[in-house]
Amino acid sequence: MLRYAITDRARFKGDEIARRSALLAQAARLAAAGIDFLQLRENDLSTADLASLARKLLATLRAHTPAPRLLINSRADVALATCADGVHLTSAPGQLTPGQIRTLYAAASLPEPVISLSCHTLDEVARAASSAQDERPTHILFGPVFEKVVAESHPSQKSIANKKIATGAGLDMLRAACLAAEPIPVLALGGITRGNAASTLAAGAAGIAAIRLFLSEPTHILPQSSH
């Protein structure tokens, strides 16, 4: 089972310095626990600050063997500048394609990048899977499977700790996404817990992606991964 953690320093207490320090400490715990991937998703940071944090995370992760792979959310420029292991692409317009990112990595004499892609519908999954080989992502993050924090109220939402939680796509949709994505591995995202992770694997997922799960239980990250 692949395990893919996503950062969110806003969940830590203290000032900016304290939060970045806590994030690095979390990364060290995750690496020691055997996480496979860590996505740096701190899009409010300036380019310089994001690159600085990426370099510190890379040093932290690469102190472990095997070292988890670090992916930078959306910012291929930062990934290249820091020699990160890859890039995570969202559905936002204007981003580079997987093929373009691979070309840039090759031009910089860097190893083949890991490229993950967010998909929220079966159509998005099908488009990714039917792309030319060089344009396919390494992994697809499909979700939200169980739930997602949203800003607006909706009949399918409940309030938890003053936040709105929307019902996810469910396991049947995840199963369909895994079939549509073949041969691209799919990681389940959205409301993943220790209690429901096994059900996503039974539905065909190759692993799980999460923020809260790995923040709350960094040293108990479910079954052993397959590096």
Listing of model-derived features with the role each one plays in the protein:
Residues 1-96, 108-138, 165-172, 176-186, ...:
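Conserved N-terminal beta1-alpha1 strand-loop-helix module at the mouth
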Residues 150-152, 163:
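Glycine/threonine-rich flexible loop motifs
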Residues 156-159, 225-226:
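Serine residues within intrinsically disordered or low-complexity segments
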Residues 137-146:
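Non-cysteine beta-strand/loop elements that form the S-adenosyl-L-methionine
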Residues 145, 192-193, 209:
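Gly/Ser/Thr-rich beta-alpha loop segments that engage phosphate groups in nucleotides
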Residues 100, 105, 126-129, 146:
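Acidic/glycine-enriched connector segments
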Residues 44, 146-149:
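Feature marks short, surface-exposed loop/turn motifs that line or immediately flank catalytic pockets
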